[in-house]
Amino acid sequence: MKNEYLLLTPGPLSTSETVREAMLKDWCTWDDEYNKDIVEVIRTKLVKLATKHSGYTSVLMQGCGTASVEATIGSAIGKEGKLLVVDNGAYGARIAQIADYLNIPCHVVSPGETSQPHLNEVETALASDPAITHVAIVHCETTTGMLNPIEAFASAAKAHGKVVILDAMSSFGGIPMDIADLGIDFMISSANKCIQGVPGFGFVIAKQTELEKCQDQARSLSLDLYDQWHCMEVNHGKWRFTSPTHTVRAFYQALLELEQEGGIEARHNRYQTNQKTLVAGMRSLGFEPLLSDDLHSPIITSFYSPTHSDYQFKAFYTRLKEQGFVIYPGKVSNADCFRIGNIGEVYPADIERLIGAIEKAMYWQVA
């Protein structure tokens, strides 16, 4: 079945027909053909995508991506721990909110939504507060589309002996990285982002020695990261509670298609071409990005809304959807914006078609 429209969002996103077709079969969660032949293969493939080094493992966790973030924060940080969070968007703020809900002490570094965090501020906090045990940062902050400089921040955190948690929700699979080289202890992502699967579970790729320290630390039964991992390790891919079987099988297919495309490097190149084509086309129509070009990720881009008195996002959105494209409203607190994603089963030709559709949808310019 063909899609009625293209999702130009940061996830859920447009998937291939073959990924959707992979969900047409039912699976028994007790069978080896599911646990060993699908779940365990996924776990192995994820680690290989994340690093060339040994010592890392992976665990899949039911629910939205935020559930995996909460599982990590709630399991990795002990009763005496303290978290430093870099917050320059809604998703950094969400990590801090999770810590607050879980009664985990938290130091927040907030440079603002349109600025990259300042390394010296983080280093000062780490040097002055020995109670901090963990540092968390979002790689691609999809509030704006900003790509945060994780190398410098992870390096600073490791220099101070801290455990590093990376929210790579909207970057893993679409931006090359080696988490061992970066010094990342826990990396979190989701099925419905750059791997191009469908919603239903997230996953954590972790240094095994750090994950083993999480035993008996979880603040939630269903979000116990260690227990979920241990169950999968001992039972060859078995989940503790109901597994999202159809989503998992679709993700397995999506991983195969990532390999067929040429791996993360090739997908990154496609996403970059999409994003550059998008920005050039939007500028030709008079739209300006919220961020300077050097801050952009290849994942999603925020554009200032037109200042014309007749412009309304909902009307603009509806006209685009009628032409087969779905975009995202803005999420920046101090600027009127909208967002356009370019990940998923989206190619440069699709972006060129989008630019034509946007030109037709600019009703406020009609005389």
UniProtKB/Swiss-Prot annotation:
**Key word Transferase present:** yes
Q: What is its EC number?
A: 2.6.1.37
Primary role: Involved in phosphonate degradation.
Name the UniProt key words of this record, in alphabetical order: Aminotransferase, Pyridoxal phosphate, Pyruvate, Transferase
The protein's matches in PANTHER family, at most eight in alphabetical order, are given as: 2-AMINOETHYLPHOSPHONATE--PYRUVATE TRANSAMINASE
Q: What is the lineage of its organism?
A: Bacteria, Pseudomonadati, Pseudomonadota, Gammaproteobacteria, Vibrionales
> Which reactions are catalysed by this chain?
(2-aminoethyl)phosphonate + pyruvate = phosphonoacetaldehyde + L-alanine
Provide the protein name: 2-aminoethylphosphonate--pyruvate transaminase
Q: Which organism is it from?
A: Vibrio parahaemolyticus serotype O3:K6 (strain RIMD 2210633)
EC primary class: transferase
Provide the family line: Belongs to the class-V pyridoxal-phosphate-dependent aminotransferase family. PhnW subfamily.
Q: Does the keyword section mention Transferase? A: yes
Tell me the domain of life. Answer: Bacteria
Q: Which NCBIfam families match?
A: PhnW-AepZ (TIGR03301), PRK13479.1 (NF010006), transamin_PhnW (TIGR02326)
Q: Which cofactor does it need?
A: pyridoxal 5'-phosphate
Which InterPro entries does the entry mention? Aminotrans_V_dom, NH2EtPonate_pyrv_transaminase, PyrdxlP-dep_Trfase, PyrdxlP-dep_Trfase_major, PyrdxlP-dep_Trfase_small, SP_NH2Trfase/AEP_transaminase
